[in-house]
Structure formats: C-alpha cells, structure tokens
C-alpha cells in the first residue's frame, strides 16, 4: 500500500516540503537584489548563498543526502557531502533564474538554451495532428522548461499544469499567461476536461510526474532499486486523448546554459497505463543519474511525508 494511504484505507494528501519564505514579498526582495547583477555573477552569488543556507538546514540536508545515497551508489561520505552542497547551490542558481525570467517573453528565453535534443519527437507528433503530454520532474529548472517549450517555433499552445502556491499573490506573479502559454492549477475542478480538450486540439500539456498526488490513482514503481509512489494520472489522460507521453527535462550545463531533452513518445493503450508509467520512471531514473545534483526533493522520495490531521 502506498505510504500516503492510511492503515484504514483512508487516502490522505501528501504534504510536500514548504517554508515561510514562499511569499511574494520575499520574492520581490530577492529579485530586486538579483537584478543589479549580470547573470554570471548573479548565479555565482546565488550558489554561494544557497550552499550556506543548506548547511544551516540539517533536516533538509539529511533528506537530500539520503536520496543521493540511492543514486550515487558507492560514493564516499565526502563525495556525498559535496553532492549535497552542490544540490543546494544548484537550487539557488535555478531560483535566481526563475526570479528574472518568470515574466519574460517566451521568445526571449531562446538565448538561454545551449542545446536541445529530441525536438524531432515532438515535431513528428504535432505533424501527425496529435497533442502531447510532456511529463517532467523536479529536476533542473522545471518551471522554465514549460516556457522553453512554448518558445519553439511553430509549436502549438502549451498548457503547464502546476500545484497551487500557498500565497495566491505569489502564484499570480510567477505564472503569467501568454498567447502561446497557459498555466493550469491542478486543483481546479474543470482542469482535466480542459486539458483533454486541449490535447484533442493537438496542443501540448506539460506536467510534473515525480510526486504522488495522495489519491487512489498513485502506483508503486521500482525507482533506484526500491519502490516509490508515482501518479498514474498523466497516462490516463494521454490514453483518453489519444496522445503520447514524452519525458522532458530542462537541465543546466557547465556553461550556465540550459539543455532541453525530450524523449521518445510513449503511446498508451487502454489497460497499458501502468506500463507507460514504468517507462516514464525508467526515463526519470536515467535523467536523475545523469544530473543527480539537479534533483530537488527535500524529503524522502521513497516514503513521502503525509498530513494525517
């Protein structure tokens, strides 16, 4: 039974990591400080600050280290400590970019992309008149990934599905719709029907696929040698729309530019949703193994925290 299902069978919602700084006022203050620096210096300062913050958060540091122990098998204690430091530093760099780029014209974002791989998969799907469900994870700069998809020349409209922020004002600030880009809150009652219609029009839907929802659609899948819960919903949606699922990740290279990787389409037939989920988790495992210090989960992924109140 998934760890977020109570013993009596009652489904409880996972409570993911959150903190009191996730408020618009703090974001505006951080953005004002970041805006005075050129990007290379801004990222460098953000890495230093985030590395220091990580060392002041022992509980979060322990969780990140435990997650990385499963990924970096055979790593020494010193190597694991360095990887934890790098994880916090990378999170700071991506946050600095989010502050400056979240309201930018999607077309302007192309200058930040150094390499793309797998665009041919998307082009073939769209050319055939299908929509596409792009499933990503909390790996790299996932917030920027949806915007980068929208700025592809000739791409159809992209609908980015995200969880609601605790601060509604912050959500309005971070997620600004554009003609080619629309943000959808997962909890909205009409969200699924709207996404289904968009896919049937040949548009793209981008969503997270690495955290369970706490609902009965979650399934346990082998992930780095142990079972973890993942949502089946993206594959149910794709099957209903007759659209494929494509793994998609936006990571940062050493030169500070982003690399966008889109995997081969996973077509989902009726009754094969679980097989599709397993294929997606295998792709996620490969991506995390390639970029372990760009994987941002500050809790035990194999036993996510729950709210039993």
Language-model features, listed with the residues they occupy:
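Non-catalytic C-terminal accessory region of glycerolipid acyltransferases
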Residues: 18, 56, 81-85, 126, ...
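Active-site metal-coordination segments of metallo-dependent hydrolases
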Residues: 62, 163-168, 227-229
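Short, flexible loop segments at the rims of nucleotide/cofactor-binding pockets, characterized by
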Residues: 108-114, 181-187, 223-225
């Amino acid at each position: 039974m998934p760890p977020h299902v109570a013993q009596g069978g009652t489904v409880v919602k996972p409570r993911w990591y959150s903190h009191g700084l996730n408020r618009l006022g703090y974001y505006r203050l951080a953005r004002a400080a970041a805006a005075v620096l050129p990007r290379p210096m801004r990222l460098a300062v953000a890495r230093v600050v985030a590395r220091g913050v990580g060392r002041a958060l022992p509980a979060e540091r322990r969780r990140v280290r435990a997650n990385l122990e499963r990924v970096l098998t055979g790593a020494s204690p010193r190597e694991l400590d360095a990887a934890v430091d790098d994880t916090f530093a990378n999170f700071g760099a991506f946050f600095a970019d989010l502050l400056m780029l979240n309201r930018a014209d999607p077309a302007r974002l192309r200058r930040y992309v150094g390499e793309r791989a797998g665009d041919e998969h998307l082009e073939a799907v769209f050319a055939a008149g299908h929509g596409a469900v792009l499933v990503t994870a909390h790996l790299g700069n996932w917030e920027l990934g949806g915007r980068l998809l929208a700025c592809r020349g000739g791409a159809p409209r992209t609908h980015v599905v995200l969880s609601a922020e605790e601060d509604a004002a912050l959500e309005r600030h971070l997620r600004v719709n554009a003609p080619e880009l629309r943000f959808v809150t997962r909890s909205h009652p009409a969200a699924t029907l709207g996404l289904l219609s968009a896919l049937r029009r040949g548009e793209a839907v981008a969503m997270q696929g690495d955290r369970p929802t706490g609902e009965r659609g979650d399934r346990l899948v082998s992930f780095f040698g142990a079972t973890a819960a993942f949502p089946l919903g993206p594959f149910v949606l794709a099957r209903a729309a007759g659209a494929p699922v494509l793994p998609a990740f936006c990571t940062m290279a050493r030169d500070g530019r982003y690399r966008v990787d889109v995997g081969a389409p996973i077509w989902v037939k009726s009754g094969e949703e679980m097989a599709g989920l397993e294929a997606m988790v295998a792709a996620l495992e490969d991506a995390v193994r390639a970029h372990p210090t760009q994987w941002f989960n500050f809790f035990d992924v194999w036993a996510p925290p729950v709210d039993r109140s």
